[in-house]
């Protein structure tokens, strides 16, 4: 029997409930394939501030570094709005990214047939939408040099610097190519090469990687065109790879297109242990009420099985079970429509388990 070590970080708000739901699903799925899991519970975010005075402890960092994967619920909430900015709950995510060397964010956007009505786009536009945004996570303008406001009156100014190195672009392109190879073998590299010098380097390296991976059909879009194409023809995309800034914007656009943010998972990957989490927040207003949608966390666990645990059959089983639950009409409050079966967090997890 193989053995895996997984760090669980519930975090704050609804994090405890959705992590418990995902763990329950995983326990059943792992048992079916004879995998033993050592679950390691750790705190981060506001829960860690309350317990230890900091959002991320060395103990949690070391546990994550030594694990096969990290599954996170959500961090933050108004309770910690007035703490010192240097120890805000969100610093835990940034700290984990840095300590684990996580330079790539994978954001799948899939619209299930049973949820097409939730998209703000017409049904005929969202049929067959199933793509992944590969976002560079540690470079670009978010991490560049900057100068806050200087001067006075009409002469006030501020600036931010966008820089990308060959090394940074090559490694994110490699992940995009490998991701596409496991899917439909199509990559769109997104930049603003008609204006930005950093984007011209980005495109040059993307073209080199395309030549080195002839089995992958590669195209090149400007970011403004990509934003439009995501609205008028989102089904054309398979893998989108782009910079930190552009990926931040486009992945949120993709989330809105889906119409069901509670179902969207994500993965942050790099040189160390990968981190998996749903894209939604900690929703403290519904915590402890068995109202949270656990499917984004359950699907994040499926991504964990596929990318970190080498258990693609478990990932497929979980994803298929989630899709069947939706077909059968089970809905938490955030995606409920009259005539369907309204359930809570634990009931939704149980429905997934019954269909594994």
What are the residue ranges of the model-derived segments?
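Glycine-rich phosphate/nucleotide-binding loop
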Residues: 46-49, 230-330
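N-terminal glycine-rich phosphate/adenylate-binding segment common to multiple enzyme folds
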Residues: 50-159, 245-247
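Glycine-rich phosphate/pyrophosphate-binding loop and the adjoining helix
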Residues: 138-139, 143-183, 187, 193-195, ...
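Buried hydrophobic positions in well-ordered alpha/beta secondary-structure cores of metabolic enzymes
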Residues: 12-15, 68, 134, 176, ...
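N-terminal beta-loop-helix "entrance" segment that forms/cooperates
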Residues: 34-58, 228-230
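Glycine-rich phosphate/diphosphate-binding loop of Rossmann-like nucleotide-binding domains
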Residues: 7-24, 28-30, 153-224, 236
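Buried hydrophobic packing segments
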Residues: 22, 26, 206, 297-308, ...
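Extreme N-terminal starter segment of soluble prokaryotic enzymes
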Residues: 2-6
């Amino acid at each position: 029997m193989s053995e895996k070590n997984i760090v669980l970080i519930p975090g704050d708000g609804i994090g405890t409930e959705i992590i418990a739901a995902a763990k329950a699903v995983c326990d059943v799925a792992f048992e079916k394939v004879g995998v033993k899991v050592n679950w390691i519970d750790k705190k981060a975010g506001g829960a860690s501030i309350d317990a230890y005075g900091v959002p991320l402890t060395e103990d949690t960092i070391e546990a994550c570094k030594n694990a096969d994967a990290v599954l996170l619920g959500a961090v933050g909430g108004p309770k910690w709005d007035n703490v010192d900015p240097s120890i805000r709950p969100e610093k835990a995510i940034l700290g984990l990214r840095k300590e684990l060397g996580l330079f790539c964010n994978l954001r799948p956007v899939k619209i299930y047939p049973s949820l097409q009505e939730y998209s703000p786009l017409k049904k005929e536009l969202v049929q067959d939408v199933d793509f992944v945004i590969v976002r560079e996570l540690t470079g670009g303008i978010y991490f560049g040099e900057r100068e806050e406001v200087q001067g006075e009156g009409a002469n006030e100014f501020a600036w931010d610097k966008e820089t990308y190195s060959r090394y940074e672009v090559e490694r994110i392109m490699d992940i995009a190519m490998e991701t596409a190879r496991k899917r439909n073998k199509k990559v769109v590299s997104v930049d603003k090469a008609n204006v930005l010098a950093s984007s011209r380097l980005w495109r040059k390296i993307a073209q080199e990687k395309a030549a080195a991976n002839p089995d992958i059909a590669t195209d090149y879009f400007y970011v403004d065109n990509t934003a439009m194409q995501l609205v008028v023809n989102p089904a054309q995309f398979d893998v989108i790879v782009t910079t930190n800034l552009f990926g931040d914007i486009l992945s949120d656009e993709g989330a809105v297109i889906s119409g069901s943010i509670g179902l969207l998972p994500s993965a942050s990957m790099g040189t160390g242990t990968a981190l998996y989490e749903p894209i939604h927040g900690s929703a403290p207003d519904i915590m402890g009420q068995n109202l949270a949608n656990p499917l984004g966390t359950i699907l994040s666990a499926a991504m964990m099985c596929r990318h970190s645990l080498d258990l693609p059959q478990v990932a497929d089983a979980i994803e298929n079970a989630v899709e069947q639950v939706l077909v059968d009409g089970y809905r938490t409050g955030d995606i409920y429509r009259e005539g369907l079966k309204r359930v809570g967090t634990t009931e939704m997890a149980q429905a997934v388990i019954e269909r594994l």
